[in-house]
């Protein structure tokens, strides 16, 4: 007979085997649905630059999260637009702001849905940058404690996972330390490379 040491046909013998060893699959349960939370009530306004996506008030976000879960989506990521902005972006860690309120409300209404929260300052600062700025220079190390405050506030609100989207060096390690120190050792950190495929 033939001297065939490599016989890939073995891995194609039936559908179950092929499913088991296939390289890549994508299912609705692999997706995380983005929710863009805004202040106010009864708001569901389409985002011009993201057709099919909406700015949502907290109550509307809860409804969309439930719909997504009912369709098989197992996670949402919360992005926010605050009621106020300042130089530090302090509304990003304010527990009364839309992101933290949406996290709480979604967790209460759809308890089995994974809630991921975006960690950044750009939406919350008057400069629109993800870091503190002094004389046109990003203050990397001074920004890290602020990002930590954001992540801890999101964990306190009930986020299962935080996803830093800023560009500060050392942010993941700093956030991990802050979450652990605050007692949120089971809150995960997700890389942005996993979000945008």
Where are these regions (language model features)?
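Glycine-rich, proline-tolerant flexible connector loops at the mouths of alpha/beta enzymes
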Residues: 45-53, 74-98, 164-172
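Conserved, mostly hydrophobic/aromatic
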Residues: 35, 61, 118, 154, ...
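Alpha-helix-loop-beta-strand connector modules within alpha/beta enzyme cores
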Residues: 89-117, 171-191
